[in-house]
Amino acid sequence: YLKAVCFDGEVAEMEEGMDTIVGNGGIRLSGGQAQRLALARTLCHKRPVLILDDPFSALDRKTEEEVFANLRKLTADGIVILLSHRLYLFPQMNQVLWMEDGKVTAGTHEQILEKCPEYARLYEAQAGSDGSREHAPQTPGDHKAADKEEKPEERRD
């Protein structure tokens, strides 16, 4: 699982390798290292539903994309609910939930772009901020995405 979260190389370089103590009495991990270690630990315990709250927030984009691709492979037979403020991965999701003020709009990334002007605005702003406007292809799996800044329509709870 360390390889899946792109942490195996760094662990191999640690003086004690896999036996390295981290935290109290051990070495201090960076935010990205700690986040990847936590995700690896989570992946060790296979569950049919996995809920991840911004699991890539401390990762650089290249590492995030690699970890996300590996995560999709490892969880292809399950459901992943990914909460994130970074929308560029959402075109790869089978289902996107956009929430705001107690209202939920569900659909594919393209459907949410059409239904929710605020989602479209935020997505375009983020896509433009890194110079990339590429949309990733839709791929199979029951992965779902829910954005923290979220937007309206359809259901009210």
Predicted regions and their residues:
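H-loop (His-switch) and adjacent beta-strand-loop-beta switch element
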Residues: 93-110
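Conserved "ABC signature" C-loop
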Residues: 1-21, 46, 63, 118-121
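Conserved hydrophobic alpha-helix in the ABC-type ATPase nucleotide-binding domain
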Residues: 66-68
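ABC ATPase nucleotide-binding domain "signature" region
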Residues: 30-31, 37-42, 82
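Catalytic Walker B motif of ABC-type/P-loop ATPase nucleotide-binding domains
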Residues: 50-54
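Conserved catalytic loops of ABC-family nucleotide-binding domains
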Residues: 70-84, 90
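A short, proline-enriched helix->beta-strand linker immediately N-terminal to the Walker B motif
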Residues: 44-48, 77
